[in-house]
Amino acid sequence: MLIPQSIRFISRHPLNRGRKLKALARFAAWQIGSRLVPGPVVFEWVRGAKFLVRAGERGLTGNVHTGLHEFGEMAFLLHLLRADDLFVDVGANAGSYTILACAAVGARGYAFEPGPDAYRRLTENVRLNRIEDRVTCLEMCLGAEPGTVLLTDDLDSANHALAPGEPGARTVTAAVSTLDAVLDGERPALVKIDVEGYEAAVLEGARRTLDEPTLLAAIIELNGSGERYGFDESQVVATMFGHGFTACSYDPFTRSLARLSGRDPASDNTLFVRDVPLVAERLTTAEKITVHGRQF
């Protein structure tokens, strides 16, 4: 994200409302300080959770600047999950969602990340938070069937499975399994899938998991990137509806869910909720969270 885009994003972020100057001062301090300090910086985050961040890291620096980079979705996770729930993070990257679920909340987790550099950063953050006993990190892709896939390896948080005919990039070969095979009957309460357009294939290999009544919700990236593989995102929505889920958006300040007819037009991610009244009760009874001095 370029600096002008970053400034716009920070200025408009819900946790920075009424605090624009303070947020921009934090951004400027990071731009200067991160270049003066050699190596990664430990950032104290939420409820004692922390992460290692380096200058230029796209996903994690968003949390430095705003508190919660993807506010609605991350707050939904924090309000929904309870200690010892099972959380599955498909496309974990450096582990933002895994850290929130397993370090801040105390849930158990599976974190899937096939990119070698991102996987190294993920495991660093798991060790930093001393949650190795609660998180299983797996350096692999998930898809519709077992096999292998070529991945880009030089696009930071935008690394993805190479599409047919995609021009040459630096690539690595990754193993592919299915979510159903890996979980082998374990029952998550929440699944997050952010695999840069490969979401439809992941869901195809997760049909047994999607049918589990204990799966309360899923956070799925739907931003048009599936077109590179010939996937129609309306089919992703239809798949989730077919498994009994409702598309929703979430307001963390009012702790209210709003039902949607399809993907969330205001976000790159869409929440899918199985039992809206049950999930709403969990959300409203969760303890308050404080991030960057804002409580919700």
Describe the residue ranges of each PLM region:
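Phosphate/nucleotide-binding beta-alpha loop and adjacent structural elements of enzyme active sites
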Residues: 1-296
